[in-house]
C-alpha cells in the first residue's frame, strides 16, 4: 500500500487533523493522526493490518505474541495479531506506569512484537516493552500503522532522529512515514501566537 493511499485513508476518515495539538509525548504539533477514526471501520482496519503483516512476514521475523499499549494501540495491535495468526495482549497505564494486567501472562523467552497505531518518538511502546521484558519475554521488534518520522523503519530512507526512543538494533515496521512539524512546549510557535493546544490522544482523554 503506497503512501498516497494511506494518506487518503486518513483523509477520507477525517482522521488527518490540522490545528494545535498536544501529543502523548508532551510535544506540540500542527497535525494529528486520529487513528481511531480510521480503525472504526473494520474492513479498513483489517486491510491495513494485513498490509503491515505482509511486511513483517517478508522480513522473516518470528513472533509469538503482539502487545500494544492501551488505549491507542489496542485496535491496531489486535488486528495485526489476527493477520499474523498470533496471540494479542495489552499493557495499560496504572499510576503512571505501563503494566500488564487482566490476567495476561508472558512466558520466559516469548517473542513479542510491540504494536502502536502511530509512533512518534516511541515512548509508550518502549514502556510496554520494558514491562513484558521485566516478566521474562523477549521483544523482537516494533510496529505501527504510521511513523511520524522520528524513528527509522524498515524500508525507509528517513534517518533516526536524536529524540527517537525505539532501540535502533530492533526492526520497526510501519506502512508509511508522515513527517509533520513537532515542537517542544517551550519553542512552539503556535503557543507564541496565543493558541492553546488540545489533547486528542490516549493519555488523559
Curated annotation (Swiss-Prot):
Provide the cofactor list for this protein: Mg(2+)
Instruction: Report the Gene3D superfamilies cross-referenced here.
Output: 3.40.50.2020
EC supergroup of this enzyme:
transferase
> Which domain of life does the protein's organism represent?
Bacteria
GO MF annotations for this entry?
magnesium ion binding; orotate phosphoribosyltransferase activity
Q: Which UniProt keywords apply?
A: Glycosyltransferase, Magnesium, Pyrimidine biosynthesis, Transferase
Task: State the reactions this protein catalyses.
Answer: orotidine 5'-phosphate + diphosphate = orotate + 5-phospho-alpha-D-ribose 1-diphosphate
The EC number on file is: 2.4.2.10
| SUPFAM superfamilies (UniProt xref) | PRTase-like (SSF53271)
Q: What pathway is this protein a component of?
A: Pyrimidine metabolism; UMP biosynthesis via de novo pathway; UMP from orotate: step 1/2
GO terms of biological process kind:
'de novo' UMP biosynthetic process; pyrimidine nucleobase biosynthetic process
Listed binding positions for orotate are 120, 148
The entry marks the following residues as binding 5-phospho-alpha-D-ribose 1-diphosphate, namely: 116-124
Tell me the InterPro entries matching this sequence. OPRT, Orotate_PRibTrfase_bac, PRibTrfase_dom, PRTase-like
Q: How does it assemble?
A: Homodimer.
Its family?
Answer: Belongs to the purine/pyrimidine phosphoribosyltransferase family. PyrE subfamily.
Write out the function statement from the record: Catalyzes the transfer of a ribosyl phosphate group from 5-phosphoribose 1-diphosphate to orotate, leading to the formation of orotidine monophosphate (OMP).
Descriptive protein name: Orotate phosphoribosyltransferase
Organism of origin is Wolinella succinogenes (strain ATCC 29543 / DSM 1740 / CCUG 13145 / JCM 31913 / LMG 7466 / NCTC 11488 / FDC 602W)
What gene is this protein translated from?
pyrE
Amino acid at each position: 500500500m503506497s503512501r498516497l493511499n494511506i494518506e487518503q485513508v486518513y483523509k477520507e476518515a477525517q482522521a488527518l487533523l490540522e490545528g494545535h495539538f498536544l501529543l502523548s509525548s508532551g510535544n506540540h504539533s500542527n497535525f494529528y493522526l486520529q487513528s481511531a477514526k480510521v480503525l472504526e471501520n473494520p474492513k479498513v482496519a483489517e486491510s491495513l493490518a494485513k498490509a503491515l503483516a505482509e511486511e513483517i512476514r517478508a522480513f522473516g521475523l518470528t513472533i509469538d505474541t503482539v502487545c500494544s499499549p492501551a488505549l491507542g494501540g489496542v485496535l491496531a495491535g489486535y488486528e495485526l495479531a489476527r493477520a499474523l495468526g498470533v496471540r494479542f495482549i495489552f499493557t495499560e497505564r496504572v499510576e503512571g506506569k505501563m503494566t500488564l494486567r487482566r490476567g495476561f501472562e508472558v512466558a520466559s523467552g516469548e517473542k513479542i512484537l510491540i504494536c502502536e497505531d502511530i509512533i512518534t518518538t516511541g515512548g509508550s511502546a518502549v514502556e510496554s516493552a520494558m514491562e513484558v521484558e521485566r516478566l521474562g519475554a523477549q521483544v523482537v521488534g516494533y510496529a505501527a500503522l504510521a511513523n511520524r518520522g522520528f524513528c527509522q523503519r524498515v524500508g525507509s530512507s528517513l534517518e533516526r532522529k536524536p529524540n527517537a526512543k525505539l532501540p535502533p538494533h530492533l526492526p520497526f515496521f510501519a506502512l508509511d512515514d508522515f513527517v509533520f512539524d513537532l515542537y517542544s512546549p517551550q519553542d512552539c510557535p503556535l503557543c507564541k501566537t496565543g493558541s492553546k493546544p488540545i489533547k486528542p490522544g490516549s493519555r488523559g482523554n
